[in-house]
Amino acid sequence: MESKLGLNLELVNQARQSAAHVADDTQRFIDQHTTVTVERAVCRLLGIDGVNEMDVPLPNVVVDHMMATSFLPMGAAWAIGNAMLETGKDPQAVAEAIDKGELDLSKVPAHSDEEIRAAITPVVNATVERINKNVAKRNSYLKEWGDKEGPYLYIIVATGNIYEDIIQAKAGAKQGADIIAVIRTTGQSLLDYVPYGATTEGFGGTYATQENFRLMRAALDEVGEEQHRYIRLCNYCSGLCMPEIAAMGALERLDVMLNDALYGILFRDINMQRTIVDQYFSRVINGYAGVIINTGEDNYLTTDDAITAAHTVLASQFLNEAFAKDAGMREEQMGLGHAFEMDPAVENTFLYELAQAQMAREIFPNAPLKYMPPTKFMTGNIFRGHIQDALFNMVTILTNQRLCLLGMMTEAIHTPFMSDRALSIENAQYIFRTMKDLGSELTYKENGIIRNRADEVLTKATDLLKEIEKLGLFTTIEKGIFADVKRPKDGGKGLAGVVVKDDKYFNPFIEVMKGKVAAE
């Protein structure tokens, strides 16, 4: 890619190297530990589904039983495979027997590791084949209809009722949206289980459940076939159930997933040890399922200043890239996040926003960057808000951002109406059409505001990453370097669900999926 900013590539390399060292150091911790939700995700991928009479998901029943008997370090795959050999039951029947109190995994006579792997392999292969078929179907649609060039128009629905969401999502797709994100109900990231079935009551969003995923996927396929284009579905595998929701998304052919441990640590007070382990398995699954992940750097600028803290966003992007690579993800799946969140009362902020967006594009040339619209300084004045969104759209097309979450002029007033989305889509389409090639016509002068801003942010980010390399990720978070939010290593939610792996532990899905993409 031609550089318009004349970035110091040596600094880029130094930053990337520091981030890789931080990720590799953290990976040593990850490799030694598992968590309750990692093992519940293994249960789900082994075909354990449904809830008991008390509406407790059966994966929770199995893993809670393993925690209560101090058996979780063995891992769900080993324990269930061993029980399959002893009882002749499949994983679902094993889970149901545990729920009835008929089976204690910790008391089942131990079979050899070779026998256990042989017993569980056909089940693993069946799940992997289901994911392969999902990826093949997505690829088939894209081959038939082609994929969109330029930014994806990305909108959200958030009614709380999946059936109402479907109506709004289909309307948005017909209006021109390329990605539909179903916002989760407020606080779902703090639930240490995944609700079951179709849901009609949520607050600020709709519960992420596998049935809701299935219903929305079918609805978007229906409208996609009418429109002769593939409509991507987005949801959220952040919080205390990251890998479980990633597994559900892989099984139901979701295309985009919000996925960022740092977001959960900083903004949901989830324990850092817990969520960094959870993130790894969730990214292995997303990588294999061909899912684009979205990271949450844009949120830093809601609690910190977008001008003075811009380097923390870039540093986090480097870290998220390194963690994604360690999970075997391709750069084309790394939707690194940033945002148009500077105070419009400050002079030349459009130039600063343009500089930072172009900088991200040049540093991460293969990444489908996720660009977020203004929210912090939206006042409820819909006329000014529409102009702010237009300026955001201009930066999007000038710098070739890929996932463009459309701003709403009614931001800070109410959840968008369908008419609000229609106007937002029209705004973006107008600007993207009339400015399609303007970016390639522009150059930025040496020692000008734009180049100097990019140099400043890159230099500060590189220095910060060198500091993080010395401190380690956990200490960095404790110091409040990201988003001006401090979190203790042993605080937050979910630490009790982290255990050290036994020597016999294995996760067959990491072995099969890591570094690969289904149907390729």
Predicted regions and their residues:
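Hydrophobic faces of well-ordered beta-strands that scaffold small-molecule active sites
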Residues: 151-158, 179-183, 229-237, 256-261, ...
